Amino acid sequence: KKLAVIGVTGTEGKSSTVSFIWQFLRLCGKKAGFISTVQYSTGGDAVANPEHTTTPEAPVIQKYLYQMAENGCEYAVIETSSHGLSEKLNRTGCIDFDCGVFMNVTLEHLEFHGSFEQYRMDKANLFRKLDENNHEKTILGKKVSVPSFGVVNLEDESASYFIASTKQPVLGFTT
């Protein structure tokens, strides 16, 4: 409730996209942190992620988000894996996402999800979560209404599935 939170999901390209968004926010003069497989930042420079886990366990994520808020961040960008979004593990269950970014989905992690449909459904939980809160937050001590929206790779065959998974506006992109 103290950060505008952007989640990024997809089979490939999550870490790069998280890094790009984080760097873009910083170039725009916004203080931001991020969590990805490779690195993380709680408001300062990026450091190596010692766990090398795409979406860490919920207590680790909450610790980083708390540190970001304490360090004066306005934004958090989180790499969100299908495992982390799955209701089985519920690693992201307590996060109020304001923006969801969908990169792509291909056949992967079927041993965990059991089917492609379940894999895609778990990834789309990011977009469903956009509808779960009112996006009223207190950022840097100020009450703000954070715009909520999705961003979808229109070249992916599952784009329409992700668009239909939220009531929020969705922007599309192509490469």
Each model region followed by its residue ranges:
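Short, basic phosphate-binding NTP loop
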Residues: K1-T9, S16-G29
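Gly-rich Lys/Arg/Thr-decorated short loops/hinges at beta-loop-alpha junctions or inter-strand turns
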Residues: V38-A48, D98-L107
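Short beta-strand-centered segment that lines the nucleotide-binding/catalytic pocket of NTP-utilizing
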Residues: G29-T42, S81
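Residue-level signal for inorganic ion chemistry
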Residues: V8, S15, I35, I61, ...
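Hydrophobic anchor at the start of a short beta-strand
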Residues: A32, Y75-A76, P169-V170
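Acidic, Mg2+-coordinating active-site environments of NTP-dependent enzymes
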Residues: E70-N71, E87, D96-T175
